[in-house]
Design a protein with these regions (language model features):
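Short acidic/His/Gly/Ser-rich catalytic and metal-binding motifs that mark active-site loops
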Residues: 218-221, 260-263, 302-307
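A long, amphipathic alpha-helix that forms part
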Residues: 282, 302-331
Length: 331
């Protein structure tokens, strides 16, 4: 019996959707978005030579039809050489550009409501949310309360967090409420409990995810860990994982898939860094059950390189992924 493997390269976009002008990063609309194409152009221009050099090399993904799909998405002529895989592009019908929206649609369930987004102001959160965090955390206040990059706000407020014990709360252009805390001084279990306590209130407001963002280290050398955990709204209807299970199949989640879908329809989850996830995926290629679905998300494109606008790092990760996934194709 056949098996299916659905692999998401998180944030690796190949062109803006028709409604891109309705979405923003700060004051800049998403019109003309094309993460992959822009990284390739930067590589061609010699602007991504840190730890690598030259043109972007993705032979295995290209063989599947990656550049054919990218050309179609941005309205350019597709390459003359044939692809050896089936390729295409899709446009979301839901309103939103965040993780739950995209993944739910991949799983067959458009989002039936508009998500709640917090304004890019200071403070960003209503008083009732800030007060609820303080009560749940047992603190006299919170830090942040704004739009921010996770790595930057941890660098800026991590020392104050360790001194006061106040959680760092922030958001972004997505429908998220993120809480960062030090794994040792605040406690990882305590951070998870805080997020679990806040999740029902925020989910009722149609905030898509509450994200625990643990970090370690000392001032000047803070580092986020792989112990991130997402508390997402439960899908309001059946998804492809449910259909697989109804047919008697087994569903494997790799990466943050379990968190994104609140474990709906998922039998087991394998987590870790992207390097760990590739090993898990390799093992599942060898050992996943007949009739099963493996749904994987490789998040470090976004978390380590996209948010930081690290073009060279993103290109390195793309080339690493291409080489690693190519070994699986050969099996």
């Amino acid at each position: 019996m056949a098996r299916a493997f659905l692999v998401v390269m998180d944030s690796v976009g190949i062109g803006g959707a028709p409604d891109a002008a309705h979405y923003f990063n700060g004051d800049v609309p998403d019109t003309g978005a094309n993460t992959l194409g822009h990284i390739r152009a930067a590589c061609d221009a010699g602007q991504a030579n840190d730890g690598r050099s030259g043109a972007l090399q993705l032979p295995n993904l290209a063989r599947l039809g990656l550049w054919h799909a990218e050309a179609l998405a941005v309205g350019e002529p597709v390459p003359d050489h044939p692809a050896h895989g089936q390729w295409g592009v899709a446009t979301e019908v839901s309103r939103g550009k965040d993780t739950p929206t995209g993944h739910w649609e991949l799983a067959g369930l458009p989002v039936p409501w508009d998500w709640t987004y917090f304004p890019d102001t200071n403070p960003s959160f209503p008083v009732e949310i800030s007060n609820a965090v303080q009560v749940a955390a047992g603190t006299d206040g919170i830090l942040g309360n704004c739009h921010a990059s996770g790595t930057r706000i941890i660098a800026e407020l991590g020392e104050a967090h360790m001194r006061t014990g106040w959680p760092i709360c922030y958001t972004s252009a997505d429908s998220v409420f993120q809480i960062a805390a030090h794994e040792e001084s605040f406690g990882l279990k305590r951070l998870y409990q805080l997020c679990e306590t806040m999740a029902p209130m925020l989910h009722d407001m149609h905030v898509g995810r509450i994200i625990a963002r643990p970090f370690i280290g000392q001032p000047g050398a803070f580092e986020r860990t792989v112990n991130r955990k997402d508390y997402a709204v439960q899908p309001p209807g059946p998804i492809v994982m449910d259909w697989v299970k109804d047919a008697g199949g087994h569903v494997y989640g790799v990466g943050k898939i379990g968190d994104i879908f609140s474990m709906q329809g998922i039998d087991e989850v394998h987590k870790g860094s992207d390097a760990d996830l590739m090993k898990h995926l390799s093992n599942l290629v060898d050992g996943a059950k007949d009739g099963s679905l493996t749904f994987a998300n490789f998040v470090e494109f976004d978390s380590l390189f996209g948010h930081r606008r690290d073009v060279a790092g993103y290109a390195r990760h793309l080339e690493w992924f291409d080489a690693a996934i190519g070994q699986l194709f050969d099996r």
